[in-house]
Design a protein with these regions (language model features):
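Acidic low-complexity segments
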Residues: 28-53, 290-295, 299-307
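Extended, charged low-complexity segments
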Residues: 255-309
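Cationic, low-complexity basic patches in intrinsically disordered or flexible, solvent-exposed regions
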Residues: 7-10, 27, 31
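His-Asp-centered catalytic microenvironments across diverse enzyme cores
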Residues: 31-49, 64-70, 127-267, 273-274
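Cysteine-centered nucleophilic/redox motifs
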Residues: 98-124, 145, 240
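Secondary-structure boundary elements
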Residues: 33-97
Length: 309
């Protein structure tokens, strides 16, 4: 497997995944919505280029999305609803100036890619990042996408927090692929792949995935579990992440890390005002006025945790 995998027309097969799965849109009518406002989405991320379904378009919107729409988990941390309905996602992430976690981010991105004319398959992954050695295999709790561009499959993912991809990757194993940030690579594993990134010259795993297509209900189950399970870290820890052209911002409770030019600056946000300011400035969030949010920020500001990304 030393060459980029191709969609073989007309059968369109990738590692045994048939055309009805690989093409995406016919297989998943639930993800095609006339209620999606492409103009508003493109304005939100600051894209004014071509709307042709080309690799240049895909790379451009993939880079802009994580800079404009950050990863954040305020809703589950506050016990607020996390809806995956496209109208709710547009109200929150587009019109509302908020961010979200992987399901919100990649479902929104999926609708944008559909509207631009791309053929997309919905995938799921098991997270490996920061998992201690010998950790039991976790659930498929992360969403990513497979995008067909002129017969070539690309992995797209705008929702993986502090190490989010900022460029789609060819589904081509063993090759280090540059991004606007760190190099990434895919390694074959069992019937799927492991995604790794290079940190300080060392390759580290992020997640493993197969090409088995996912239905909207699959994401609803994982979304509900992460929102409600008492041991879900998203109910216990404030997390924020944003990838800008000049670096990465990562927030874990009251610890802010700024990764830029191969250096990392860390600082403690010692009160609720500093936390709110960072969320609004560093993470470009429009925060609601809420006594619950104010109380949570005050509580989190008294913690001390090291950011992992």
């Amino acid at each position: 497997m030393n060459e980029a995998l191709q969609f073989d027309e007309p059968t369109q097969t990738i590692l045994g995944v048939s055309s009805s799965h690989a093409s995406g849109r016919k297989f998943y009518p639930e993800f095609v919505s006339s209620k999606f406002d492409l103009d508003a989405y493109l304005a939100r991320i600051g894209y004014t280029g071509s709307r042709s379904a080309t690799i240049d378009t895909l790379e451009a919107v993939h880079a802009l999305h994580p800079a404009a729409i950050p990863f954040e988990n305020l809703n589950p941390l506050l016990g607020w609803l996390v809806s995956l309905d496209i109208e709710a996602l547009q109200a929150k992430l587009v019109a509302g100036g908020r961010g979200g976690w992987c399901f919100e981010q990649n479902i929104l991105f999926r609708h944008a890619l559909d509207a631009l004319g791309f053929s997309v398959t919905n995938l799921a992954a098991r997270v490996l990042w920061n998992a201690p050695a010998n950790t039991p295999t976790g659930a498929r709790s992360h969403m990513l996408l497979l995008v067909n561009v002129a017969g070539t499959p690309y992995v797209a993912d705008v929702g993986f927090g502090g190490n989010v991809l900022t460029r789609p990757l060819r589904l081509e194993p063993h090759i280090a692929q540059p991004t606007p940030h760190e190099p990434h690579r895919l390694l074959p594993l069992d019937n799927g792949f492991v995604l790794e990134f290079s940190a300080g010259g060392e390759w580290k795993p992020l997640y493993r995935f197969t090409l088995e297509p996912q239905f909207p209900a699959d994401y609803e189950v994982s979304n509900w579990y992460l929102c409600h399970h008492p041991r879900s870290m998203f109910r216990q820890t404030l997390i924020g992440a944003r990838a800008t052209p000049d670096g990465r911002y990562a927030l874990r409770d009251n610890m802010l890390a700024i990764h830029r030019n191969s250096k990392t600056e860390k600082r403690i946000l010692a009160d609720a005002a500093a936390l709110r300011s960072s969320l609004e400035v560093d993470f470009a969030l429009q925060l609601p006025e809420s006594p619950e949010l104010d109380a949570m920020l005050e509580r989190v500001s008294q913690k001390t945790s090291e950011p992992r990304a």
